[in-house]
Regions:
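Secreted/periplasmic carbohydrate-active enzymes, especially glycoside hydrolases
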Residues: 1-336, 341, 345-349
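Aromatic- and acidic-residue-enriched carbohydrate-binding clefts of CAZyme catalytic domains
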Residues: 292-297, 351-371
Length: 371
């Protein structure tokens, strides 16, 4: 795996999607850090903070020689909100949704020892078709419209620049927010792994592969010892004397499903627990659970909503300090690394979709009818 995080070239664009040629260097580019929001990285100007429309990133990429003969994939943890990605001017990926990962197979375009130009454009505009939602693109961000007709108000409207009018109560940070990596797999590879454990120790699994190589799975305990195994792409295996996952002050015990398929290997950690609602109670592993927790954001000074492992560790330690056991990902899916950390540290997670602001009842109609 090759990290592409670090300093990239950056330029603000307009609302025109194809303003710049992705095969050429960006004009008047400035340095920008990735992963991070671009909004707060230059205090000498308000242009980044107030930007409305497309923003452009670039960097050169060289594939190491040891990747020869492998499948090569370019992966983004998230780009907010809409992303277009090019290699040497060729469009390789488009993605909508600023809080989920996406990737592209670039094996045919990226060869060992060759340097190519990677260009990313991201659009921060929100409207009735985006998540989270906002008002229509291009509306003026002037909130004194109730005073229509007053000369000073009308003059302010005419002078106002188009801006986002989000229907949510947090800043609309934008940019390449989570890690960017190149990774390799064999030509025949493990595509997906599903693990569904039960508190009686049975584990249903399903492995999706791209080839015909046999699949072997092994369950490892927290010390790395094999406790169960099976052959085949799907089935059920049983963990003897299973340890259940519990939030602190209990033990957040984790197992690992070790999957092999030909030359490819994948490890998926998992905890064994059940959760259900019975009447007015939430039961974890059949026992009443009392939630003590927090809502939080990924925002922080300077890097905005950019992925920060230090901040994640600090937040988890604050949750422990408060003797809490749960966190709500208000108001969008967080970085995958945060969920892994909560699994390890015994923190329950209430995971949210980024659908804040849609509303209910009649307020939903504009979103249903949006073309």
């Amino acid at each position: 795996k090759l990290s592409l995080d670090g300093t990239w070239e950056f330029a603000l664009g307009s609302c025109a999607e194809n303003q710049f040629d992705p095969a050429k260097p960006l004009p008047d580019a400035q340095p920008i850090a990735v992963p991070a929001s671009y909004n707060d990285q230059n205090d000498q100007t308000t242009a980044l903070r107030r930007h409305y429309g497309w923003a452009w990133y670039q960097r050169n990429v060289t594939l190491p020689a040891f990747c020869a003969g492998q499948r090569v994939v370019l992966r983004f943890g998230s780009v907010t909100h809409t992303a277009n990605v090019w290699l040497n001017g060729q469009l390789i990926a488009q993605h909508k949704g600023g809080f989920t990962p996406f990737e592209a197979d670039v094996t045919a375009l990226l060869h060992p020892g060759e340097t190519v130009l990677l260009t990313v454009a991201c659009d921060n505009r929100v409207n009735h078709s985006t998540l989270p939602v906002g008002n229509e693109d291009g509306q003026l961000a002037f909130f004194g419209s109730d005073n229509a007709g007053i000369p000073s108000v009308e003059a302010a409207k005419r002078a106002a620049a188009p801006q986002n009018r989000p229907n949510f109560d947090f800043f609309n940070y934008a940019g390449i927010h989570r890690p960017v990596v190149l990774y390799t797999t064999p030509k025949e590879y493990i595509e997906d792994v599903t693990v569904v454990p039960a508190v009686d120790g049975t584990v249903q699994y399903a492995v999706k592969t791209t080839g015909s190589a046999p699949v072997h799975v092994t369950v490892l305990d927290a010390d790395g010892n094999a406790v169960a195994s099976a052959e085949g792409a799907e089935g059920t295996i049983t963990i003897p004397e299973v340890h259940l996952w519990e939030p602190r002050p209990g033990t957040p015990y984790l197992y690992t499903l070790h999957v092999t398929c030909g030359a490819d290997v994948y490890d998926q950690t998992f905890g064994v627990r059940s959760i259900e609602v019975r009447g007015t109670q939430v039961l974890l592993n059949g026992k009443p659970l009392y939630f003590k927790g927090f809502c939080k954001h990924e925002d922080f000074t300077a890097h905005g909503r950019g992925f920060d492992p230090v901040l994640n560790i600090k937040d988890v330690n604050l949750i422990h300090w408060a003797n809490a056991n749960a966190v709500r990902t208000s108001h969008y899916p967080y970085a995958e690394e945060f969920y892994d950390l909560c699994d390890r540290e015994g923190i329950l997670v209430m995971d949210e979709t980024p659908a804040v602001g849609i509303g209910g009842g009649a307020a939903v109609n504009p979103y249903k009818e949006y073309p």
